Amino acid sequence: MKTSLQIAAEATPRPITQIAEELAIAEQFVEPYGRYRAKINLDLLDASHDRPRGKQILVTAMTPTPLGEGKTATTIGLGMALSRLGKRAICTLRQSSLGPVFGIKGGGSGGGYSQVIPLEDSLMHLTGDIHAVTQAHNQIAAMTDNSWYQKNRLGIDPEQIQIRRVLDVNDRFLRSITIGQGGSQHGIPRQTGFDITAASELMAILALVSGENHADVMRDLRQRIGRMVVAFTRQGQPITADDIQAAGAATVIMRNAIHPTLMQTIENTPVLMHGGPFANIAHGNASVVADQVGLRIADYVVTEAGFAMDMGGEKFFDIKCRAFDAKPAVVVLVATIRALKAHSGRWNIKPGRDLPTDLLQENPDAVYAGGANLQKHIRNAQLFGLPVVVALNSFPDDHPSEIEAVREIAMSAGAFDVAVSKVFSQGGVGGEELAEKVLAAIDQAGQAQFLYELEQPLTAKIATIATKIYGAAEVSYSEAASEQLAKLEANGFGNLPICMAKTHLSISHDPALKGAPTGYSFPIREVRASIGAGFIYPIAGDMMTMPGLSANPAAQQIDIDEHGNTVGLF
């Protein structure tokens, strides 16, 4: 089979103005960035206020291997399959961070015959939103340090400056640094570090702002940025971006980033790409405004939640769905036979290495042995009150006995149905079985619900997630984490939802624990607050907010030829 880049290069994208026209988006709301991408101005929300709302389909997954299990390709393929069945469908996806693109995991634009095109545009910069977030965030960070340096009228405690600088890169050398060296005219030395932009609170804000019209969204953006807690005083009082008078400038930098970007799939199904928060160190979903626009202009919005149901899936309901008045009608859970075998504990799949040859051999017993992971994710999804359709992402090495094992595992856990998805190799036609079963599930959909109430104490909400979703027996806190929780409660932030930062390679905090571990203690080592975004995020285990590069990063294979064509990109 051809590479994803070769397939993308042979595809024929249509002018983005035509894609917009077919969605009945008036020309005045389409702001092209070249021929094949365009910002959709949020004035469209005002103009489409009376349109009936579409239905939302949430795509998530079982716990992935480091290679990923094809969730984005499934999301795109399902959108294309719905279009083939005569439905007006649109996909909403996050914008890819350059960190994973040049790292090991790859981008978030799908692959094979189920991808967003033009591929390079979708992976490299798009319309500049991530750069706007980076600039705005670092502007606030610079003004925080400057406020402390310039007479410190707000009483900033330098040991409690919360905001760290960000870059859209994987770079472990920036995790812990000293700034302000070289004498007093260059600042005052202090320890800090960088996070990846996808972990920035401003990225989470961009993905969570909402409103009934353009003005509402802009107002919400300005207010959320103003509420960002950048530091504390020695007395424990929060200091915000408004306090240091940085919120206005940051909002101006991001004023164009609030508009979602319209792209298309390889079969010309429309895609809205907007927002890029990671799901392991942020809430991991495409923006609320992309969904709002999609629900106004399409009958079905297929959206993706990052990593697995315990990660982006849970956060989709308990964080994103609280930000606007819409909930999905069905959950699609992506599974692969290789991931099920990996969760048997018999193989150790590592990024950058070929799959063990014996893992590809027919072995339904290994599939059953890893089935607890898939079943746990199905039951987790059911906690939110919706039917679950399992999409088995098919690979050439899958065997009929293994496929039947997946069906038995899923149905015994209460899945609505199981569909074999071949969208990677066949495009939309390979997703028609999945689309038909999703539509059948929507006809019987229940009412989506939250996992916990916001009024519960922070520790109770954390315990609910850890025990009900992760299978832990208890939660343990470091001394620092306990103090941080107490300070947040004392400052009136106890009614915010929880955004757990943990590994995506296990339902637990420990990437070595496969399957569906139970009976363990879930450790919280640190608790941070994203008050502007509107959540508290505890950090479990050794979770890093700035990734590092592997020994053989993907960037080493990427180059350009004499005609300006990208080579080596997937």
Curated annotation (Swiss-Prot):
GO terms for molecular function: ATP binding; formate-tetrahydrofolate ligase activity. SUPFAM superfamilies: P-loop containing nucleoside triphosphate hydrolases. This is Formate--tetrahydrofolate ligase. It holds the Pfam family FTHFS. It catalyses: (6S)-5,6,7,8-tetrahydrofolate + formate + ATP = (6R)-10-formyltetrahydrofolate + ADP + phosphate. It comes from Herpetosiphon aurantiacus (strain ATCC 23779 / DSM 785 / 114-95). Transmembrane segments: none annotated. HAMAP family: FTHFS (MF_01543). Its EC number is 6.3.4.3. The keyword ATP-binding applies. The gene is fhs. ATP binds at residues 65-72.
